[in-house]
From Swiss-Prot:
One example of a Gene Ontology biological process annotation: snRNA processing
InterPro entries on file: Thc1_RRM
Name of the protein this chain belongs to: Uncharacterized protein C18B5.09c
Organism in which the protein naturally occurs: Schizosaccharomyces pombe (strain 972 / ATCC 24843) (Fission yeast)
Pfam family, one: RRM_Thc1
Superkingdom per UniProt: Eukaryota
GO cellular component: cytosol; nucleus; sno(s)RNA-containing ribonucleoprotein complex
Amino acid sequence: MEEKNTVSLSKHIERPVEVVESHSTYILSAQGLYLTERVLRSYFKQPDLIITWKDSMRAYLTFSSPQEAQKAYLDSLRWGSQLNAIIKPFYGSHDEVLRLCKRKRIIPLQNFLTSG
């Protein structure tokens, strides 16, 4: 018989996070104040990362594989507020990202600071 002070716990079954193999799950959306390419590359260390700016506060980060995007997204959740940006998966193709960014091209703040 169990004592009064013990608690019985059910076993927790851990499942691996599933990666959906799709052409559209390798892009993350980043939104925040004072985002620059230098800041993003200091957090996301993938050498083949493509950063496409929508405007001065929003960028799309394109990775070479869904696994890299998933790892980067999980890392961003672990950083918490250090990055000071909202990172979300973007479910669309890279062509759609380019189409969205063509509508209104704004040069990121970093380009103003380094020019001249």
